[in-house]
Curated annotation (Swiss-Prot):
Annotated Peptidase S39 domain residues: 206-400
Signal peptide feature range: 1-22
Native source organism of the sequence: Turnip yellows virus (isolate FL-1) (TuYV)
Domains: entry comment: The C-terminus part of protein P1 and VPg/P1-C25 displays RNA-binding properties.
E.C. no: 3.4.21.-
Protein's recorded name: Protein P1
GO molecular function, one term: RNA binding
Residue ranges with Polar residues bias: 474-484, 558-571
Length: 607
């Protein structure tokens, strides 16, 4: 191996020497040529006319190398180490290049072989699968064509057997389990219904509580009677104000459950009836017994009511209250009192009758809750509190105020009440997070976009004429109508009306009226005597004097000296001033009256 490397190195050095010698010879020869002739193609045909180039011979004598015996051991060892390291590096680089080439070639070959093997395998699998399918169809077709009747009988028997197996498995497997589960659920429901007692009665009069009623209308007429479709009374509802800017109808849930065809009636004498089926549910809870409804457009104006503010369960405290009901003589207000809580309901002392369900309890002009019914165990009525729904019945922000004194509900009860309406809040949040497909909300649009329809393209009429077609029968008898202008129609109507007026009769009647007024004798104008005003009676008892000074307005009339007469006189209240005679009653109105003699008038003359 070492001899081969040395031989290869010798060949490389010899080829390098020959290449360098040839290059130096070419440079020396080209240096004697002028610049304009060495590379100019035009002088090639005059080469024989040029003088021969000058020949120069360079001689260089190399010094004779020193013999190796004269070198020192250090130089010899250094030369041997350098020679061995260079030979090793050359051999290593050559081996590394050979190994890298072999690795690249082997990797490429392996890759090509693997791709080819996978491709052949997939194609073989495809051919095998297609062959099996084709063989199956061929065999099936051979059986059907040669043994048609037995094959159809076998298919029918297979179908019947399959459905029989399913029926047997259901009868002996799923059916008993289904029957047992239904029986167990019925027993459980009946047992729970027998054990559970009703939470509240619909109406109740509280024993020992003194109440009074006064004729009074609800605040803002926000209480609305609810009736059945037949017109019989069912309960009450109220119009409340929400924090999203809308007005909602609030009532008890059991009123809507017991009266599916309920109708809201105006209590202000308006003959307006709105079915509650046209209202959409905003929030509802069977256990909380409060339902909020969104009405059709302008339902408040149709029922003649305005929205009132509400107090949620988190801010409810013990206080005095009032409940309204509609009697034969009109609205009456009954006294009530909130005393505490029972679970998620509020204990109220009040006297109620049948049909009061859904009526709100007020404290001033604010709604506290909805009348739900009477307690089945205690001596009090129950009021359903209004849940705190952020964005609906309560604001989305938090007030920086202290807690209300005498709060009815604890924090756990408030959380339980809000949990009853958790599903409602999910729907509200989904509505808030709604994003249209276009990404642009209707409320954010400044103006509605105009819709332009494509008009029919106007044809020039210069195309190729169609075939002339003759009529096969008589023409159409439908007369052609032309559009009449409205202005022309009005002119025709006015001209026809003017033509019917008889001017001669009008002139005759005018002359008769004027002559009758001119021949009338004027009536005598007599003055009426002014009415005499009754004089006030004089004081019968004179004032007592003590000898002290009394102001003039306190002194008696007898003690006052007579005052001097003023220089001027009070003008007369009569219409005619002094110096002028009253006009005679027989003088007509158009005759000029005599001027007054009090002097010339200072007013400007009229034109």
């Amino acid at each position: 191996m070492y001899s081969k490397l040395m031989f290869f190195f010798a060949l490389c050095s010899i080829s390098f020497l020959f290449t360098s010698e040839a290059a130096s010879t070419m440079l020396l020869e080209s240096s004697y040529l002028p610049l304009n002739q060495s590379y100019a193609p035009g002088f090639l045909y005059k080469r024989d006319m040029l003088p021969p180039p000058l020949q120069a011979v360079l001689t260089y004598t190399c010094p004779e190398p020193r013999p190796l015996a004269e070198e020192s051991y250090n130089d010899l060892l250094r030369a041997i180490s350098q020679k061995s390291s260079s030979d090793f590096q050359n051999a290593y680089s050559l081996a590394l290049s050979f190994s890298s080439d072999f690795y690249q070639h082997g990797l490429k070959t392996l890759k090509d072989v693997s791709f080819l093997a996978v491709e052949k395998f997939l194609w073989g699998l495809t051919r095998l699968w297609s062959s099996l399918i084709l063989a199956s169809f061929s065999a099936l077709w051979w059986l059907v064509s040669n043994f048609t009747t037995p094959v159809f009988c076998l298919a029918l028997l297979y179908t019947v057997t399959k459905y029989m197996v399913k029926t047997v498995s259901f009868l002996f497997g799923g059916l008993p389990i289904w029957i047992i589960s239904i029986a167990f659920s019925l027993l459980k429901k009946s047992f729970s219904a027998l054990r559970s007692t009703p939470k509240c009665l619909y109406e109740k009069a509280i024993d020992g509580f003194k109440s009074f009623t006064i004729p009074q209308s609800p605040p803002k007429s926000c209480v609305i009677p609810i009736t059945h479709a037949s017109g019989n009374h069912a309960g009450y509802a109220s119009c409340i104000k929400l924090y999203n800017g809308e007005n909602a109808l609030m009532t008890a849930t059991h009123v809507l459950r017991d009266c599916p065809n309920a109708v809201a009636v105006s209590a202000k004498g308006l003959k307006t009836r709105i079915p509650l089926a046209e209202f959409k549910t905003i929030a509802k809870s069977d256990k909380g017994d409060v339902t909020l409804l969104r009405g059709p457009p302008n339902w408040e104006g149709l029922l003649g009511c305005k929205a009132a503010n509400v107090i949620t369960a988190a801010n409810l405290a013990k206080c005095k209250a009032s409940i309204y009901s509609f009697d034969r003589d009109g609205w009456v207000s009954s006294y009530a009192e909130i005393v505490g809580s029972e679970g998620t309901d509020v204990m109220v002392l009040s006297h109620t009758e049948g049909g009061h369900s859904g009526s709100p309890y007020f404290n001033g002009k604010t709604i506290l809750g909805v009348h739900s019914g009477a307690s089945a165990t205690g001596n009090y009525n129950l009021m359903a509190p209004i849940p705190s729904l952020p964005g609906l019945t309560s604001p989305t922000y938090v007030f920086e105020t202290t807690a209300p004194q005498g709060r009815v509900f604890a924090q756990e009860d408030i959380a339980e009440i809000e949990g009853l309406y958790a599903q409602v809040m999910k729907r509200v949040q989904q509505a808030e997070d709604f994003k249209p497909k276009t990404g642009k909300y209707w409320g954010d649009m400044e103006d509605d976009e105009d819709i332009f329809f494509e008009s029919k393209e106007d044809l020039s009429g210069n195309g190729v004429r169609g075939t002339v077609r003759g009529t096969n029968g008589e023409g159409s008898s439908t007369p052609k109508t032309s559009n009449v202008d409205g202005k022309e129609m009005m002119e025709k109507i006015i001209s026809s009306l003017v033509g019917k007026i008889n001017l001669e009769n009008i002139e005759r009647k005018v002359i008769e009226e004027i002559s009758a007024k001119a021949m009338k004798t004027p009536k005598s104008r007599r003055r009426r005597a002014p009415k005499k005003q009754p004089e006030s009676s004089k004081d019968t008892s004179p004032r007592s004097t003590t000898g002290k000074y009394q102001p003039p307005h306190v002194r008696s009339p007898a003690s006052v000296t007579a005052a001097n007469c003023p220089n001027t006189t009070t003008p007369s209240k009569k219409k005619n001033l002094a110096g002028g005679r009253p006009s005679s009653g027989t003088i007509p109105r158009w005759v000029r009256k005599q001027a007054a003699s009090a002097g010339p008038s200072s007013a400007p003359k009229q034109n």
